[in-house]
Amino acid sequence: MRRLIILAEVALGLLFASCTKEEQRTLSVIPAPLKVELQQEVFSLNSETGLYIDASEGDKKILEDYLVASSMNLKPVIAEEGHNVVLKQVAELPEVNSSEGYVLTVTPDQVLIRATSGAGLFYGVQTMLQMVDEKGLPAGVITDEPRFAYRGFMMDVSRHFFDKEFIKKQMDALAYYKLNRLHLHLTDAAGWR
């Protein structure tokens, strides 16, 4: 009788363990955004996907060069309508409290990144680049801003030499993960001569 009870408990345990919830979409972005609302649709990247940037001239040039060289193969367009990635610098963005914050909205027809500064647009682009997979970009709305104003990395170049190319790669990695300071530890001497 006791074996039967144990067998029934094991069977029930296995039965309940095999029941799963509906698969939820997760987002692998570092650092994790403040607010994520994903949907089932996808924005598909194709040869017709363009890039439209509405920002100050300096920010526009930097962002355009960066995205054209990225793995997304975007080409600049002169109108925001169409199957495009759109970056807009706006005067106000009530959803965020930081100039480095952004709102990334992805629909099946368009990707829209809004921010109040070039830095906010850049960090929105980093999130978008981390989200891209073989299917495209998952639809949804991401609202994000940094939790800390100073997000840095220290590299000790006083005790070990790093060449210029290595430091550039490190800077690209820091930007990808939205770190905004590179501290180069140049010397251990008490004075700088």
Model segments located where?
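Short, acidic/polar
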Residues: 162-174
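Aromatic-lined carbohydrate-binding/catalytic grooves of carbohydrate-active enzymes
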Residues: 177-193
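Flexible loop/turn segments at secondary-structure boundaries
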Residues: 59, 161-162, 189-193
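The substrate-binding groove and active-site-proximal loops of carbohydrate-active enzymes
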Residues: 115, 151-164
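Acidic, contiguous N-terminal accessory segments
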Residues: 19-151
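Bacterial Sec-dependent N-terminal signal peptides
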Residues: 1-28
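Catalytic alpha/beta active-site cores
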Residues: 151, 171, 184-185
